[in-house]
């Protein structure tokens, strides 16, 4: 009884202390009202609640008080997990095999030359020989002449005349023979007998052509007898050196004169040249070996003989230098020289990447045979020369060639001449490997096995593979196989020869733009970068997963529930059962969760390691549905309170409660702590990816503007220039073609003085210089007069001079008839008016009474007035000239006049006539 009483007393004391403690807490911390708490924001679990979790006993008032004094979780999701029973077991997946990252494809570096379709025509120089015939018919009337008809035609010059006159003497015949309407016609220049005329250069020529002719004049004869028709003929022999063009398939060519010759420029009498196209009869064509033409300017023969072709058309004769077709014509032309090219094989095709022009070309892995395209003999030589030049400049000291030049036809019609090469270090490694393995393979075939797919494989050395000893049966079998092989080879050769003759060679057509190649380069660049990045990420990810799998496998033994929950991304309770894990799914708590303020248990030396809670599984549960448990990690609620520890001094704990943290000190609740007050440390590894580098697209022209303009068969601008200058070049037009007769005369005088020796030449130079100055002055005046503005100015000056001469003549005549009136018109008019007023209109007959003395004085006055006027003019001229001679002369004249003394008396101030009248 003593023990029972003692235990009962202790229990009573503990309960009393708890009640007192609860009362204190209630006073310190405001309790949450018993109203309906806030509902968590998370979704509700669809699982049913285990009935074993619900309590069966009725809670006592002490527990209700403790629950009411707790802290209600206002936000956050809470879960409760039943213990795993083994009904559901799982296992961790074994390690996976990770993909290996491909570091690259089969790359080959080298030098390349890219060819394109040659759209430019084949150009060459040609000579055109013809005679321009002009027949004019003029009607002569009594007082006029009119042109009634004019006939113009071009006729070819015979090849014999070209041989004997034009290219032999630099002359041409004035006679023309031509066939019209099956009748042979003859024409003679100036209607005279046949003569040989010199070919002189034309004054007017286009930049791309030269011309010579025998005359600049067109004859037009008019007789003396009127009322008749007169006919005259002009024959002008013309030789033109022009540009000729021909395009593929070179079955004709055009001249810059506008004429088209329907024969191939490569047609000839040799075996291969006879197969070329020719639309004319054989007698119209002629080929001369070792021909030496004459330069009509210098009158000298050509230095080297050539093979000359002559063809006669109905209007002209054309000649040109014959050359072999394979040497001159080529259907491909060089576009780009690439000093750095990378070739890689991808999905059965080659990709040629050129970073310098940001382009990628795609072709088959089989080489292109140049024999399959027409006229491609120039490609091999140009490609080899260009590649060798680049190699000598940049790679001779660092790289070696690993194969011959290979040709590949890329998409878009580009032919790539590629020659692979490797560095010197890599070549040494290959050679050391060959020496180590005692092999005799060709280094080029070893480094570039796809260089020649048709060549036989090289046999190994006798030291490496011993040959078996032949037997009789094997010899017989070898002979039979040899015969069968020989027949098969002969049949194949015959088939190939027939196929070659029957197969039509196909011309390579090139696109006018390489935008597709630039887009291919951009796509390949992006694809390579992205694929490499993704491959590395996939490999690294798989490796990391395998390593983490080992960590998961070990950590599941420590905390299986946390590991399995993180793996399944779902709240579960787990327990290790040997090599498997038993799990049960956690249930979301829909009810309220209350956190108690104290973590102390009934034992004074034992405390809870995690806060105790009370909760309800469902909403609106009564007091019977309240469960006592303990707060676990990550808002998990245990249905039991088994997590205890010895009570410690200065204990501090933070626990996650909902979305916030609660702080306990000395196992007593202090306050809530928001997550923002707690610093976060991240366990995530940042993924650092490299961004794509920038690529700029450069505009490239496959064909320049000049090439596109030069693609036509005819140069129409040249034709128009030629046609417009044709009349100016060969006809006598006074307004355009002027013969400089002065130059002819001066040239004759110079020739005369040159014949007199050096002294005569010197004298001639002086004479010609002076004469040239005079002629230039006269010609300048004449040209000024010929100018309309000059003529108008001269006419106005002549009219002004005539008007001035008329007024001067009138003034002189007035001086002679009445000098006083001319000199003093105002004084004379006033005297006349005064006299009329004094004597009236009828007193004019009183003019006989004159004073002789006054008349004499008047004469003296006039004399001295003239002398004064002369002196004033002399002084004025002296002042203008600023010279002292005139001033001295005028002063001397004044002194002389003063010394003469007065020879006249002073006039009277009164008029005696008036005094008489007054009387």
Curated annotation (Swiss-Prot):
GO terms for biological process: symbiont entry into host cell; virion attachment to host cell. GO terms for cellular component: host cell endosome membrane; host cell Golgi membrane; host cell plasma membrane; membrane; viral envelope; virion membrane. A proteolytic cleavage by host furin generates two subunits that remain linked by disulfide bonds. Residues 1-28 form the signal peptide. It is a single-pass type I membrane protein. Residues 138-144, 223-231 are annotated as: Involved in fusion and/or binding to host membrane. SUPFAM superfamilies: Viral glycoprotein ectodomain-like (SSF161008). It is found in: Virion membrane; Host cell membrane; Host endosome membrane; Host Golgi apparatus membrane. The record marks 460-461 as: Cleavage. Keywords: Disulfide bond, Glycoprotein, Host cell membrane, Host endosome, Host Golgi apparatus, Host membrane, Host-virus interaction, Membrane, Signal, Transmembrane, Transmembrane helix, Viral attachment to host cell, Viral envelope protein, Virion, Virus entry into host cell. A motif (Golgi targeting) lies at residues 864-867. Residues 29-788 are virion surface. The chain crosses the membrane at residues 789-809. Residues 906-919 have a biased composition (Basic and acidic residues). Disulfide bonds join 81-586, 98-542, 172-237, 330-378, 607-647. Residues 900-919 are annotated as: Disordered. Glycans are attached at residues 106, 216, 321, 364, 438, 456, 493, 496, 499, 666, 688. It comes from the Viruses. A motif (Internalization motif) lies at residues 904-907. Residues 733-786, 765-785 are annotated as: Hydrophobic membrane proximal region. Residues 810-919 are intravirion. Belongs to the herpesviridae glycoprotein B family. Envelope glycoprotein that forms spikes at the surface of virion envelope. Essential for the initial attachment to heparan sulfate moieties of the host cell surface proteoglycans. Involved in fusion of viral and cellular membranes leading to virus entry into the host cell. Following initial binding to its host receptors, membrane fusion is mediated by the fusion machinery composed at least of gB and the heterodimer gH/gL. May be involved in the fusion between the virion envelope and the outer nuclear membrane during virion egress. HAMAP family: HSV_GB. Homotrimer; disulfide-linked. Binds to heparan sulfate proteoglycans. Interacts with gH/gL heterodimer. This is Envelope glycoprotein B. It comes from Equine herpesvirus 4 (strain 1942) (EHV-4). The lineage of its organism: Viruses, Duplodnaviria, Heunggongvirae, Peploviricota, Herviviricetes.
